Amino acid sequence: MAAQINPSILSADFARLADEAKAVEGADWLHVDVMDNHFVPNLTLGVPVVESLARATDTPLDCHLMIEAPDRWAPQYVEAGAGSVTFHAEAAAAPVRLAREIRAKGARASMALKPATPVEPYEDLLPELDMLLIMTVEPGFGGQAFLDIMLPKIRRTRELIKKHGLELWLQVDGGVSAATIERCADAGADVFVAGSAVYGASDPAEAVRALRTQADAATAEASWSCDH
């Protein structure tokens, strides 16, 4: 699969979200960070903004729910127009049931793991998912430095995906930039959330294209891709 670049609107101008979405129309998805000031120490946006964004852009929405009680709230984001909904393993009471509900409502189901959460306990759950998100920073704030210590975890996750023959996307989020995206792709990631690296650029659309080119080149040389 070709690398996918998902600009994070956490780094966009919140007063101009519709315009900021249009500025990256060549992106694969628009990454929407939902934070509740409980699961993470920050508060961003909710269902009404997602509904408005879904009307304002043709780019599908990739909603990352950094919230408590995702079992209750995640289905509402599908109804609001999200094409993919990510809940956190650390917050979900019944992740299999929730993933199935998200899928039943018509969206892709994704689960996120914080840096300290190992992937191995969730191996048997992976077939229930369309994507797994490996956080490469502590969730809650944009603009953080990439955690290199997550690269072995990305590799182990890719190995699990191959072991089970899954068509599971592997997303990374946090500190992804021109300086780090190739390492992520080499380790096994194929979906890349980029905030500051896109919206901090003078030409966000060109930044998306450049990141995709870098990721595709690194993937082509990666051992996991050559073995696929």
Curated annotation (Swiss-Prot):
Q: Does the keyword Metal-binding apply?
A: yes
Q: Name one GO molecular function term.
A: D-ribulose-phosphate 3-epimerase activity
InterPro entries named in the record: Aldolase_TIM, Ribul_P_3_epim, Ribul_P_3_epim-like, RibuloseP-bd_barrel
Q: Which cellular component appears as one GO term in the record?
A: cytosol
How is its cofactor bound, per UniProt?
Binds 1 divalent metal cation per subunit.
Q: So where does a divalent metal cation get bound?
A: 31, 33, 64, 173
The EC class name is isomerase
Q: State the Gene Ontology BP annotations.
A: carbohydrate metabolic process; pentose catabolic process; pentose-phosphate shunt, non-oxidative branch
* Enzyme Commission numbers on file: 5.1.3.1
- Cofactor(s) the protein requires to work: a divalent metal cation
Query: Pathway listed for it?
Result: Carbohydrate degradation
List where the protein spans the membrane.
none
Q: Which family does it belong to?
A: Belongs to the ribulose-phosphate 3-epimerase family.
User: What HAMAP family would the database entry show?
Assistant: RPE
Query: What protein does this entry describe?
Result: Ribulose-phosphate 3-epimerase
